[in-house]
């Protein structure tokens, strides 16, 4: 797209998503995410009735009497958006491609963040980390994020959610609120293969323990069901492989639908094990209602 077309598209998304963030989501965001984080404030001498789990043993040893750590609510949050830029985002059969809805959802979350005076950053990932935008405040920063959401083209086309989560773990030392925005079409995300080399614990488990992690699945109707249109040449958007498929065969359509259902059940298993909040949004659905459901979980 030309620079002028990009500018017009940025402006269109800004008007739509900034209004949603300010008028609808700001209050929900504040009540859901503010106050979840606790930051170290000071140490003071232990008093009867204090929680012994808060004892600072290093200070206690130096002072030769017990001291405890005092924590207070963090007034400022950092929000990280993990945005899938793999080849499968360029698929869409109804009203828009998945990448378009991902951009709007991410922009809405970004504007909600700055409306509450918090910082927002972005990790673009395929089967590697494609781009990292460090968290900052301010409208100009969000507009920069929107431009990247609309125009960024990745080097690779595969998907590795593990890489994105591991980067988040390494890059964000303090607890943050993170949204994984993807079609979640990565088998490693739902299998035991995706583990940390250090601990042997699945990376998604480590990430959800360290950070407040939510999953937003963006998918197309045809991701879940195959139409009956006869012979169809199907291309895998991530591997580039092309095969002829006879969609008139009910067995083919049923196998396709079952593969989708199996994937969704595997995702539910991940959510159950990690306690992650999550929502699925189809590209022809209203994402506003879906985000409201997510904020109220």
List PLM regions with ranges.
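An amphipathic, basic-hydrophobic helix/alpha-beta surface used to engage anionic
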Residues: 1-135, 177-182, 187-188, 194, ...
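A generic local structural motif
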Residues: 66-68, 164-167, 200-202
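Short, solvent-exposed coil/turn elements at secondary-structure transition points
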Residues: 49, 128, 155, 219-221, ...
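Short, contiguous clusters of charged residues that form electrostatic/catalytic patches at enzyme active sites
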Residues: 104, 108, 159-166, 265, ...
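Conserved phosphate-coordination/catalytic loops
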Residues: 100, 155-162, 258-261
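Von Willebrand factor type A / integrin I
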Residues: 1-33, 42, 170-174, 188-297
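Von Willebrand factor
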Residues: 141-176, 188-194, 220-221
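Short, electropositive alpha-helical surface patch
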Residues: 132-147, 269, 296-297
